[in-house]
Swiss-Prot record:
Stated role: Plays a role in virus cell tropism, and may be required for efficient virus replication in macrophages.
Pfam families to which the protein is assigned, alphabetical: v110
Domain of life, per lineage: Viruses
Induction: Expressed in the early phase of the viral replicative cycle.
Keywords annotated in UniProt: Early protein, Signal
Family: Belongs to the asfivirus MGF 110 family.
Signal sequence annotation: 1-19
Protein name (Swiss-Prot/TrEMBL): Protein MGF 110-2L
Amino acid sequence: MRFFSYLGLLLAGLASLASLAGLVSLANLQDFSTDNPLEEELRCWCQYVKNCRFCWACQDGFCKNKVLKNMPSVQEHSYPMEHCMLHRQCKYIRDGPIFQVECTMQTCDAIRLLNV
């Protein structure tokens, strides 16, 4: 009988350690953010998760993928050039939801370009 109580204590201790390790890994996951991935991870993210907003940039009023240069710009799925420049967002509709992407161009620069 005593053997089983020691075994129970041992298993309870191991379960506590495993749960503590789980908490540590959860804490690490919470610190991980996909808002600003490392430069070396950008290709992987933008190749497989093309709707991530950090994969797209506003270039000449059209939304272009930052990593996949041969990927067509999103002009056929997006609002006009003025919207992209003035609102600093790349928006496009693809099979339902509207994906929004922040543009890198400042609003004052866009207004100056539009008035030229």
